[in-house]
Amino acid sequence: MDQNVSTALKSFTQRYIDLWQQQTGRPPASEELYGVPSPCNIETQDNQVFWLPQPFVGEANLANVERALEIQLHPDIHEFYTQQYAGDMKADLGDHRFTLLQVWSEDDFIRLQENLIGHLVTQKRLKLSPTLFLATTESEMTMASLCNVSGNMVLEEFGSGKRTLLASTLAHFLDALRPVFPE
């Protein structure tokens, strides 16, 4: 039976937390998010913040993005970005290393929406079908994105039409990810 995005995201997040617990005996930590307020913050120490996911609060959709571009977004993207506040998480899928993007706080959710709008405006200007980024790669020009039309997860090169299928759905993509402890 197929999982929904919410269940798949919670499952991946728990696998990521479990990996950190196995490696360090602690919850996940981030130096990049040190000093940035968040409901996820459970402790700060040695210039890093330890975090655990927290329920998302506020308007649980990306309606601002839809209104700005007069577009209807795929339901999976709403579900992905409005399930939880959490830190970004490293993962592998096949030969690809990803950083799964997450919303850290209410302010971060506003920034995310602005970035999604910018991404979609660029695609519209280049006459590309719309995608919504969910994960970055080691290359600044390559990302994992949800195709807004098909719901497929694709590896795409920013600003080009080059896209490679990663998974048939976002839930399948999340299920297939293997959490990675940061190096």
Curated annotation (Swiss-Prot):
**Keyword Cytoplasm set for record:** no
Q: Which residues form the signal peptide?
A: none
- Keywords assigned by UniProt? Cell inner membrane, Cell membrane, Membrane
Which Pfam family, any one of them, does this sequence belong to?
Syd
- Cited InterPro entries: Syd, Syd_sf
Q: Which domain of life is it from?
A: Bacteria
Subcellular location(s): the record lists:
Cell inner membrane
One Gene Ontology cellular component annotation? cytoplasmic side of plasma membrane
Q: Does the keyword Glycosyltransferase apply?
A: no
Annotated membrane topology is: Peripheral membrane protein
> What's this chain's function?
Interacts with the SecY protein in vivo. May bind preferentially to an uncomplexed state of SecY, thus functioning either as a chelating agent for excess SecY in the cell or as a regulatory factor that negatively controls the translocase function.
* Family listed: Belongs to the Syd family.
This protein is called: Protein Syd
**Record organism:** Yersinia enterocolitica serotype O:8 / biotype 1B (strain NCTC 13174 / 8081)
> Which gene underlies this protein?
syd
